[in-house]
Amino acid sequence: SIDRKTIKNNDMQSFHYILRSLLHSKGSNLLKVVSLGLGLTMSILLFSRVAFEQSYDTCFKDYDRLYQVWTQFTINGEKLDWQQQNSGPVAGAIFESFPEQVESATCTNRWMASDPLYYGNTRFDEPKIAADSLFFQTMGIEVLTGNPVQDLQQPNVIYLCETLARRMFGGEDPIGKVISYNYQRDLTVRGTYADLPDNTTVKADAVISLPPSWAVEVSNYSWDGGDSYPQYI
């Protein structure tokens, strides 16, 4: 039989041989190690990016039941391309016409909320959206404070995401604070909501009320054109 001393000597010889081989071709081995490390790093980054893209809009509650409304216009018998901008009343009409199939619907607008916000002399350029009173209910966004179904029916009301509210007011209670929309009109903070991630098509750090009565005054909120409203059901 082979004693332990012999086995130990054989192990040491093997280790010594491996070490000599590595030192003999250390340049080649270093290149292999670096290449392997870079390959693993790129693979991790690639898979992370794929996971990020594949999880778009999964931040919304019941995202698999949330749909964006698209419109296709026909002019003089010719069908135009599908577009994600709709006439103002479309989402509401779908909601009213299919009460058993549609639980909620909302109308939004970007350009009505495209100008900066100001609190005092400080400017805030975070992305914003104008939306009606069913926005949070339809999208399934967590509301932290406030009653958006009631509040967003009124003009000149704004809801802030948690991070933006903290940036603006620090540790102060944001409710009731008045901020300026590009020094054109004052907006009163009535509520806050949970931050939305970057991988969403509806990125908004602030939501400005979009009651139909106000939309009619500033834009074409009718069935006759005015197709500038992304909508969801």
What are these regions (language model features)?
Residues 132-145, 158-233:
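Mid-to-C-terminal secondary-structure elements
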Residues 72-82, 106-134, 144-157, 182-184, ...:
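Short acidic/polar micro-motifs at solvent-exposed secondary-structure junctions
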Residues 35, 68-70, 106-107, 159, ...:
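Short beta-strand segments
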Residues 14-25:
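A short amphipathic helical element positioned immediately N-terminal to and/or at the very start
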Residues 24-54, 64:
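Short, strongly hydrophobic transmembrane alpha-helices
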Residues 1-11:
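Short, Lys/Arg-enriched N-terminal segments with co-localized hydrophobic residues
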Residues 46-114, 225-233:
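Membrane-proximal extracellular/periplasmic loop immediately following the first transmembrane helix
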